Amino acid sequence: MKKVYLTLIALLAVISASAQGWPANYNGVMLQGFSWNAYEAAQWKALEAQTTEFKGFIDLVWVPQSGKCAEPVQVMGYKPYYYFNHNSSFGTEDELRSMIKTFKNNGIGTIADVVINHHNTEGWFTFPAETYKGVTYQMKSTDICKNDDGGKTATQAQKEGVSLSNNNDEGEDFGDCRDLDHNSANVQKVVKAYLKFLKEDLGYEGFRYDMVKGFNASHVGDYNTATGIQYSVGEYWDGVGNIKNWINNTGKKSGAFDFPFHYNMTNAIRYNDWRKLYDACLMSDPSYRQYAITFVENHDIQVREDNSNEGNKDPIPTAYIPAANAFMIAMPGTPCIFQPHWKAYEHELKSMIEARKLAGITNTSSYNNYANNKQYFANAVNGTNGRKLLVVVGIPSMMTTPSKTEYTRILSGKNYMYYLSNNSETAWADKASGTYEEGFETTLTAVSKNSNAKLVYTTNGNDPTASSTQATSGTSINISSSCTLKVGLLINGTVSGIRTYNYSIKRFEPYNITVYVNTDAVNWKKVNFYYWGNIDKPDWPGTPITQTKMIDGKNWYYKDFTITQKGGMLNFVFCEPNDAGTKEKSQSVDITGINSTVFIKVGPEKDGGKYVVTNVTKEVNTGIDQPITENTGKNVNNAWYTLSGMKMNQKPNQAGIYIHHGKKVVIK
């Protein structure tokens, strides 16, 4: 009995530790992997393709709500409908699983956007029934708050003879959906099953809870304890005192976004007074900075093309985006970088993150104000092993330069500078590892107490030695091709503090793809392609397609497209137009994230009145593996085919890729 008791105690301790809200001494950096209505950039395939660039810099990626919604058009997911079906506007469930798995294999966790304050319905009161692992889960009308939608729901319920919960909403109301009563045993059962599915089945490692002002914080604590989730952050949009109260009421089982940190930054910029960074925020309190997820901009505050957030809009002016991020990344708390900022300043942000990690800064690090006035603000942040990172924002040139015996400048940009304490004893290059589209210069710096320290470096991946190429601190070297740069300190004939930088130089070249569509199952007599993304979209119902090819005994409508930019993707709807070509008779669901040649079959099943499609590219190319190279000098008599499946009369003489013996063959 005693053994069983001790086992239970140990199990409870493990659960408690894993539901601590946010780990202490955490040195990771998070990326918000989306912005408002930017569907192409947030496709699961697009995010997964960036894994190599994220690795070593980004530790967590917060992605959009991944469950399938009821709307027949692309949506951001904030009106959830299905909990266990994760085919969404951002890709298929298979693509989602692949992304999460790839991230995890590279040391990157995925944060789910969890929207449980409210739920969409068919009509006023019908929730979907979903079966998972043999158990059917479904919300009932009695799970809807009694005063939902300002009493409109109760009025409708009376008309339809439907019962609601006896409990009023615990917080703010969301008018477009039904607000859930989290005191309902059924709601708790469904939500806990959903969250366990996200963590244990899909592989999410953390939750971002949307609109937590809508229900009591205690429920977040309960859900996190039941799930054993490691990372939890709530969107409690309020002042610092109320955010702290919310964290306390979760049982300190969740972190929270540091909205005051954001407003301190925008106020400093707006009023041209950098002393406003002194103002209190979650990160500034040593007792709460563990739970502070800092950010400078997000999808609710950014400028939206549709102006749907007019009252909340508070973006960072473009000229100050690097500086705002530099301050955030240097400070304690867990920084969360906004995707548009990452896309625009990736290499610069990587160098900031490298400096943070080199100094050993975590979410619980301490700091001191170094200098300040209206024109500039500087904090010295304490890392590990006595190292410090000094961040200066505003007009850094107006500040007295720190003592060269204490600090060395390692990074500078528009409206910011980074200095690293000399006891770090390390070499440094100011261009971070990653992929670049053209050659560049990187400046090498010796950070050392020894003023006579020099630098040695190699570009072949070997550790530098005392006999390697030497450079003085501040020397810029040219990187013109892909290489591995290793640079170290040289002091009294000994090399130490080696840093490694992996540079890949790949200029993007536009390339062509072909989209093939087969409509045999739906008997369409005409086919239009409607497309959008990194391309001029046609008027609805799209471009008439007249080109066809017979491949594998089937007729395929096809059109060629050009991918014109790095990470570019196209999206499609296929439809049968009316005789006049002015509207559709019937159409497919949306197909998103296309960046390579695909074969797609339409129908016959429907989803929301639209035909479901299947990507059959692998089936059409059955037996076609990776290309092999064959010299044209070989004499082969068997048939040759183009990639589109057209048989050739003889072996091709023109260079290209062909199909031969069931393989892709490169003719040079």
Language-model segments: residues:
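C-terminal outer-membrane/trafficking sorting elements
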Residues: 15, 622-668
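Active-site-proximal helices and loops of the catalytic beta/alpha 8
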Residues: 21-36, 46-55, 65-67, 72-79, ...
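Aromatic- and acidic-residue-enriched segments that line the glycan-binding/catalytic groove
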Residues: 72-80, 118-163, 225
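Short proline/glycine-enriched turn/loop motifs at strand-loop junctions of beta-rich domains
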Residues: 332, 394-397, 446-454, 521-527, ...
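Short, compositionally stereotyped local motifs that mark structural "simplifiers"
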Residues: 423-509
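Aromatic-rich carbohydrate-binding modules that target alpha-glucans
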Residues: 463-474, 521-565, 577-589
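Surface-exposed, short loops/turns at beta-strand junctions within beta-sandwich domains
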Residues: 476-484, 563-568, 651-654
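Conserved structural position at the C-terminal beta-strand
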Residues: 489-491, 576, 660
